[in-house]
From Swiss-Prot:
Source taxonomy: Bacteria, Pseudomonadati, Pseudomonadota, Gammaproteobacteria, Moraxellales
Cross-referenced PROSITE patterns: DPS_1 (PS00818), DPS_2 (PS00819)
Task performed by this protein: During stationary phase, binds the chromosome non-specifically, forming a highly ordered and stable dps-DNA co-crystal within which chromosomal DNA is condensed and protected from diverse damages. It protects DNA from oxidative damage by sequestering intracellular Fe(2+) ion and storing it in the form of Fe(3+) oxyhydroxide mineral, which can be released after reduction. One hydrogen peroxide oxidizes two Fe(2+) ions, which prevents hydroxyl radical production by the Fenton reaction.
Family: Belongs to the Dps family.
Protein's name according to its UniProt entry: DNA protection during starvation protein
Binding, Fe cation: H47, D74, E78
Gene transcribed to yield this protein: dps
């Protein structure tokens, strides 16, 4: 197998996936990687800076989320390299590629953090759901399914902890 001339495929591999499939998959994986890195960092931002009711339960819950996110983003990055791509996980790339809006660093209330996190977990989970049909590599599809399964659960946990206004509930 010869080396690819693709801009995204720079690493030689004996993996025989079609080069076009590799290229489109690496592009999708790198978008997912940027989103997951950003989500893991803002999860820690909330974890460090929250105060209020249910602090310790939410604080500890977010630690488990972040640990899981690190595993998923590592799997995504490694898959991009396994099929001949480059994992683009620098802070510079994440800051320009992530689909998440800037996290409000001035908030401290647990409920405010839960709402901000739920919005962003929803964005990332929905992006995974929307792009999974575009993946033509079964291994990458499995990796995305695993991440989506956890993100949907975490979104549910976040939403379950958001206190509803009694006038609108």
């Amino acid at each position: 197998m010869s080396k690819s001339s693709s801009k995204l495929l720079k690493v030689y591999t004996r993996n025989n996936l079609d080069p076009a499939v590799k290229e489109s998959t690496v592009k999708i994986l790198n978008q997912i990687l940027a989103n997951l890195i950003d989500l893991s960092l803002l999860t820690k931002q909330a974890h460090w800076n929250m105060r209020g009711s249910n602090f310790i339960a939410v604080h500890e819950m977010l630690d488990t989320f972040r640990t899981s996110l690190i595993t998923h983003l590592d799997n995504v990055a490694e898959r991009a390299v396994q099929i001949g791509g480059t994992a683009l996980g620098t802070t510079q790339t994440v800051s320009t590629t992530s689909q998440l809006s800037a996290y409000p660093v001035e908030i401290h209330n647990v409920q405010d953090h839960l709402k901000e996190l739920a919005d962003r977990y929803g964005i990332v989970a929905n992006h995974l759901r929307d792009t999974i049909e575009e993946i033509q590599d079964p291994i990458s599809e499995d990796i995305i399914h695993a991440a989506l399964e956890d993100l949907d659960q975490y979104l549910w946990f976040l939403e379950a902890n958001i206190e509803q206004d009694k006038t609108t509930a």
